[in-house]
Structures are given as C-alpha cells and as structure tokens.
Amino acid sequence: MKKRIPTLLATMIASALYSHQGLAADLASQCMLGVPSYDRPLVKGDTNDLPVTINADNAKGNYPDDAVFTGNVDIMQGNSRLQADEVQLHQKQAEGQPEPVRTVDALGNVHYDDNQVILKGPKGWANLNTKDTNVWEGDYQMVGRQGRGKADLMKQRGENRYTILENGSFTSCLPGSDTWSVVGSEVIHDREEQVAEIWNARFKVGPVPIFYSPYLQLPVGDKRRSGFLIPNAKYTTKNYFEFYLPYYWNIAPNMDATITPHYMHRRGNIMWENEFRYLMQAGAGLMELDYLPSDKVYEDEHPKEGDKHRWLFYWQHSGVMDQVWRFNVDYTKVSDSSYFNDFDSKYGSSTDGYATQKFSVGYAVQNFDATVSTKQFQVFNDQNTSSYSAEPQLDVNYYHNDLGPFDTRIYGQAVHFVNTKDNMPEATRVHLEPTISLPLSNRWGSLNTEAKLMATHYQQTNLDWYNANNSKKLEDSVNRVMPQFKVDGKLIFERDMAMLAPGYTQTLEPRVQYLYVPYRDQSGIYNYDSSLLQSDYNGLFRDRTYGGLDRIASANQVTTGVTTRIYDDAAVERFNVSVGQIYYFTESRTGDDNIKWENDDKTGSLVWAGDTYWRISERWGLRSGVQYDTRLDSVATSSSSLEYRRDQDRLVQLNYRYASPEYIQATLPSYYSTAEQYKNGINQVGAVASWPIADRWSIVGAYYFDTNSSKPADQMLGLQYNSCCYAIRVGYERKLNGWDNDKQHAIYDNAIGFNIELRGLSSNYGLGTQEMLRSNILPYQSSM
C-alpha cells in the first residue's frame, strides 16, 4: 500500500535520491552542483556526551557563568557547527538538574550547519544541551538535496526533528532562480513523521501568488500522508478545457483514497473521480467510482433521456485467505454505451467494445481445486447486440500425478448461459473431461502421450424464435462425447559456434505433434462462448482450434515445427526463429455451417506460422510474426517491429500490423466484422520515436497510417522541458474514437495536454518520455 506522492505544496524538505541513467543522471548531476554536501566525518552517538570545541581570535569570560568569543568564532560539537563574528556563551545551573544549561548567542555573519541543513543570518541562538537553534532574518539550504529558502525566524527543535519557519519560503530551484516557491506565515516540518503543517500557504510562480490556503497539512516524504497532488490540465475537442486537482487521503495503514475533481468545460460540470484502495485478510483491491451529475453535451445528443447522470464503477480484487480460499473480482460497469467514447479512462476504452463483470470464489488444496464464478458483459453497440453471461459457472480440477509412470487429471464444468435478449437460446452445459498422460523427458528431449474423453451435455431452452427463423434447428437436449489422442515430441540439439562466433551457442529444437479428435456434428448446439483462437507458432500445437467448449473441431493432423536459438557467452538469447505447419489428413470441422471454411473440403498443409526475434546489438532489436491460413486463402495476420534504443530516452521504433478481412470475419463477432472500418481488414504502418533535441528538451511522437483507408489511425506529438526545479510537458494527440454509420467515416478526437511538474521533490529526473509513449491509444511496447 506504499504510495509515493509528488504533492503540489509538499515542498518544504524533500528527499532527493537521484537516478543514474542517461540524461536523467546528467540532469541530476547538474542540479547537485549548486547543492552543498556534508564533507566532515559523520559522528554517531549521544551528542550530549560529545565534547564542545571552541576556536576564536579572542576570548574573555567570567568562569563558570559566561564567556565572550570574538573574531572568527568556530564552535563544533558532533555534527553541528556554529560560526559567527561574536559568540556569547552562558552557563546556568538549573535547580534539580545535574548538568548546567549552556546557551549561545551569536552575532554577525552567523553560520550554522550540520548533516541536514545550513542556516545563515545576522543573529542566532542555540541551546547546546537540547541542540535547539534559532536564526533570525536569514537563509537556509538543505544539505545533499535540493531545497532552500528564507524566513524571518528559522528554528531547529527536537534534536533536529522539527524545522519551524516563521514567514518562511521554500523552493527546490537552484540559487539564482526562484521560478516557483511556497510561502507560509508559519511552517512546521516534522522529519520523523514526514509531514509539514503550513498556515496561510501561498504558492507563487516568480513573484506572483497563484494559490492560497489558510491551512495545509502536506506529506513531505515517502510516508503516506493526506494532501493535494500535482494538478493537471489539457484541452480536447470532445471536452474542451479540462482540469484535474487530485487529493490523496490516507485513511488508515491498510486503506487510502484519491479524490479528483475533474472539470470539463464543454460538459458544463465537474466529474468526481474517486479511487479507493484497500488491503485486508481476504486480499487487496481497488474500487473506482466516477460520477458526473449532468452532461449538457449528452443531453443535447440524447434529448429523450433528459438529465442523465453519467458514471463508472470499477472493482478489482484478488486475495487468498487461510491458504486455500481464492477471491477474485474484475467488474466494470458504466452508465451508457457512449461513456468510453466521451471520457478517457484507464479502466476501459472505446475500442474494447464491452465491459466485463466477473466474480469468482475458489478453493484449492493439494491435487484439487474448485471455482464458482459469474461472468457478464456490458456490450457497447448501437445495434443492440445480444451477449451471453455465465450465471453461475463451476469449474473443478482433480490431479493425481505419478500414478506409476502416468499423470491423471479430471476436469469438470457446469454452467448456465443467459442471454440479454428474451428471444435468444439459453442453456445449461455440463462437461466432464478425464485425462491420462505418459510424460517422458530428459535433458535433450521430451515425449508426452495423452488421451482424454470429452463428454458434454446441453439442456437448451427458449428455442422457439431461433428455430422459426433458421434452417438449422437447435435441439432441447444434446449429448456430445468425443475422445482425443495426442502425441507430442520435442528434441533439443546444441552446438558450439566457435568457428563463427566464439563463446556463442546454437540450439535446434524440432517438434512434432499428432492430434486425433473424431468428428461430431455440433449444429444442434448454439455457440454460447466459443471463438477462433489465433494461430501463432505456439498456437499451432494447441489441442483446440476454438476457445470455449461449444465448438470442438475434429482433428486428424500432424503439426511440425522447428525453433533455432543463439545464445551469447553470457547465456543471453540473441536470436531465435520458429516456423511450423499443420498438415490435415481430413477436414477439420464442427458441423456449423456459419463457419466459412467448413464449407470447403480442404486437406493438406493448411496453416503456417512463424515467429522471429533478433537482438542485433545492444541497441537494435527486431521482432516479427506471420500466420498463413489456406482456408482463408490469405495471410491471416502478420506484424513486425524494428527498434533502435540508445537509452530510456532515445529510441526509434518502426511497426507494421496486418489482419486480413477474412481473418476478422472469422474471429470477431458479426457486429465488428461487418463494420465499415473493419471490412477491408487492418493494414497499418507506424513509427514511434523519443529523442532529446537540445539541452533539457525532449520530443516524443507516434504516427500510424492505415493503408486500406489511406487515413491516419493515430497521431501523437509531445514536447517536454526539464530543469532542476520544474518540468513542462505539452502534448497533442489525434486518435480514432469511433465510426459514424450515417456518414460512413471515422470519428477522431483531438487532445492537447499541458502539465507542470515540480522537480527536486522526488527521485525521478527522467524526461517522462516512456510515460507519454505508453499513454498513446496504440501504446509503445519494447522490441528489445
């Protein structure tokens, strides 16, 4: 539950542990040039037990009551040092105290320093017993970290635990620059609790105050403390000017919340974004409730709905209790289907098409586990498309390995499917799947022989409307029993590449799998949860062509593949390439005429797939993959990515993405596959780049172009300036945000973002380029 908080006004005394990577390290080093360091040996132990050393040009006194030192006075005790033109030492025996009270008055060019702070002023006072120190009308500077300011009176109390400023100011900017500062009539900073209390707080940019609060209690370190976080602002075409002012609330050691008023000018209201985190015996989780009381844009577009409250609720939970119980929640629900088109949210996207609402409770012990779950979908589609929910679903697994040379498993499932429409089929499905396998392996190969029986019973209801409108009739009660047999063998050959590359090693890994599943006509079963699985190289060796249990395709096939890898002398993989195919002895089918290729009687080498990775050097990397399906008569999908990465702030990446229209029609639901934006498939080229362009300036950008539509799919450009005491980030993004069916063209959203970050308050001196790239609608993913 630990949370780092870069607060707006939590600037009094902040720890700065600098990173040492790329430009961030250079900037951190530059910022430290104006920061003093503690170069004397660090003294440990009780300060009162340490001797006091006084050096001066002249001294006179009335022993043991007082003494006066003048001329280059230098007093040291432990890690503390006091220098002045004149120092008056007073010693009084307090009644009932074994030790006398020793105080010091310092006059002229007073300089106090220890391993945490430097105080300078014309007049000072110190208690040598308690180490309490006062300096009037002076300056202070943090030692070993950014932070300086002025005050009418500066106090050190509680063995340097507290710093108290009267009419004081603070900035993390280096000397000679007061770009921003915070001023308070009184400031009390508690180093131990890492909190600052500020009365009459004014935040200033240059000499101009822009924010005022009569009282603030702010976090000033890594401890979780309630307080305002750094605000943010941006401009978008869908919401115009937007402003965020988050507030962090440390409720308890095991729970906290972030409350963010989010003003949207075009919507004419404030959305309240409320994030709550918790940690308890049953697990950890996060809840988000976003609420917009009214939306004048939505009301104009949907006048029949009146004054619409718009909201989002998200709940994620994962936990284990008593080592055997498992609890999981993944729940997202919004007020309407346009929510993710109108508002940016990290809990969903307009391109997702639906929101998932899943609850599960599991029980697991050795050799056995069981899970009860419910799963629903909120579909965002104007065509009022139906969807199925599992209410409820029971999954059971029993394992018994090392039964002689065999491993055994029994998997069972019972689920009830309910549709969002009243006239669609519904069903109860019970599935039992016993498996026995014989695994054999050694260091150079493996052979796994497996046999299983898949028995499924369907009890289907509400079939009248469907059977009346379709030539293929569904049956009330269906039993499907299918055996499966599989043999999977793999070898690993290894050789030293001493002749070509000394120290390098190459492997050759051939793999062969035979799979047999007899054909069963499944046309009398409605498809409740099955969809085609993508066939990359690893996918060639799956047992199933479809996910779910409603469609289990017949198989009489051999899958062959080979992988070769190259490792350097440090055992780092530098290169690999895999290629494989599925050879069908008989047609793979389910009896479902709605599946296009089942109408074609094709056998032979139907599916090919290949993947490759090449780490060309420490700075260059290449990944690519291609899948070809003769049943679709086309390349199904392909992708490639070439990246140059000098460090975390300097990178260029070129990308290509392709999905054939036949593949989309075969894999996506009909309301997507027939949509205008997908009917020609996906064929995109793009580039992502991040590069410093001048001292402390950096630029990032992303551009993706769809060659089918001859239009850009996504564009992003960001510019950031980074200094020791602040960073400014400006970004522009134009992204696809839907499709206008009436006008038959894409809808784009233009967004301009503006963010200011105060520096010197945390350990991060990076340029922020990675964050900007990953926030893109087509987020950056490393190829290295």
Curated annotation (Swiss-Prot):
Signal peptide: 1-24
Keywords on record: Cell outer membrane, Disulfide bond, Membrane, Signal
Modification note: Contains two intramolecular disulfide bonds.
Superkingdom to which the source organism belongs: Bacteria
Subcellular location(s) of the protein: Cell outer membrane
Pfam family, one: LptD
GO CC term (a single one): transporter complex
UniProt GO BP: Gram-negative-bacterium-type cell outer membrane assembly; lipopolysaccharide transport
InterPro entries: LipoPS_assembly_LptD, LptD, LptD_C, OstA-like_N
Family, as annotated: Belongs to the LptD family.
PANTHER family: LPS-ASSEMBLY PROTEIN, LPS-ASSEMBLY PROTEIN LPTD
Biological function: Together with LptE, is involved in the assembly of lipopolysaccharide (LPS) at the surface of the outer membrane.
Name this protein carries in UniProt: LPS-assembly protein LptD
The species this protein was found in: Salmonella paratyphi A (strain ATCC 9150 / SARB42)
